[in-house]
Amino acid sequence: MYEINIVKKLIVFISIVFSIAYSEIVYRVPIEGVIDLGLPPYVKRVIKEAEASNIDAIVFEINTFGGRVDAATQIKDAILSSEVQTIAFINRRAISAGALISLSCEKVFMTGGGLIGAATAVDMSGKKGSEKVISFMREEMASTAEQRGRNKKIARGMVDEELSFTHLVLNQDSILVEDIEGRKEGKLISLTTDQALKYEIADGTAENINSVLDSLDYK
């Protein structure tokens, strides 16, 4: 059986769930609430510790409406550079900056009724960011998706509602995307769990971390 270490932000302790016997150890890292500049150093420390301790995987349990683009970008960079397998478990929602963090992980799992997307950048007053900022976030999303083998058109559409496309190529087949939630002009793309699976943004569904690990054959 695997052992799950729960690592919580700004709290210096690790809660360990023991099994009678286990051969693999996994860190669980909650990403909740507003993503701010206090989060990247924490994530970097967790990854560094996991690498030094030969941890088998890190599961980022994500439930957030987003936050700062610069903070999310730092977290994304740290996850992409991780030598330990990284898994996003979207426990309800990964909106805005949460979507970027999710896409940076090697594997993405979502609960039933989950949501990912709507990642346009806004300023502190909630107004849409400048074209420069939108362009930056759009290409951050696209390049991250591409690096993980996910569809960069979908990722771009999560940031920029003005993008126009009617087809995607998945598994060498050209398919319509008219059924994607938020696809209509003037709206950002957001994907439900079923849609994220269909368009290869998510790898699977799970109702808890144990089922995520079971799906990946952790023992």
Positions of predicted regions on the chain:
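Positively charged n-region of N-terminal signal peptides that target proteins for export
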Residues: 1-10
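Sec-dependent N-terminal signal peptides
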Residues: 9-19
